[in-house]
């Protein structure tokens, strides 16, 4: 079958999201991340968000429900997917793909922007000059680097045989999958990252239309609003770990 629909989901609020907000509030140089990035868990709110997502998925008809799951190997993404599917009562063939992991920040990992400016002023200057799209921190990735690995992942996903796929991943990956499939360039993508930062446990639906793809809805958190679970953690927008 041809791939016709992607449901892109950012993981629920993580312990690192909470720590990043605290670091910003206290003007800290570093985020007190409780584990290496791949092992960061969901917060209590993140768990509730994942369960609310599951109730949303459980309400889909057979014609709307995903047929397969592709998920980042990072714990917060896997935890979101597992909680959501359990709550929804769905059992899906699952692919854990490292190409869906969060962007690697290299020497800037766990730093707030204030920390980058004070501890690595030369990288702060390079980031300002090159812009977020092309800047590659030492030991890390630019957005373009992430796009390259996502192009390969999307080719494999398209050949997997499923027509509707749930993808649980990270905010930068959601934006960059849109960039690949909708052919969004640097300027428009940076505008989207500023004006529409991807929210925790949000759903962005991409549907094949003619020779291209259309996103509708984008960043949907209606399943969280009734339960007062919407959180604002800008992730890539603020330059902190997501």
Language-model-detected regions and their locations in the chain:
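Non-transmembrane alpha-helical segments in soluble domains
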Residues: 54, 82-85, 147, 154, ...
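Internal catalytic-core helix/loop-beta-alpha segment
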Residues: 136-159
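Short, well-ordered beta-to-alpha junction loops that form the rim of enzyme active sites
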Residues: 11-12, 71-75, 93, 99, ...
